[in-house]
Amino acid sequence: VLELHTFSSLNPEFLPLYQGVLAPADEKWVYYSPQAVAHKKLPALGSEDVRSAFGSAVRVFDNKEELETALRNTGENNAVVMMSSGNFSGLNFDELFASY
């Protein structure tokens, strides 16, 4: 899961630079917080903007609870890579992955 968190990564004009970066991943997930976009006073960012940059196979999350539910449903024996300069809106990884 890649979190878009920095000023540049949340900027719709910067997003095309991500083209192909998740290509090696079996599943491609991207998370961003609309609240972070608003807090940074950046132009609105939509799921389609993200999908256009990363490709149609990407699963886009803009809601922490939906991301958490999806992560809980990944099942055992899966490697999940979390990449961010942020904190996934405060997601508690110890609790989330405690059963694994």
Question: Each predicted region: which residue ranges?
Answer:
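ATP-dependent carboxylate-amine ligase
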Residues: 1-100
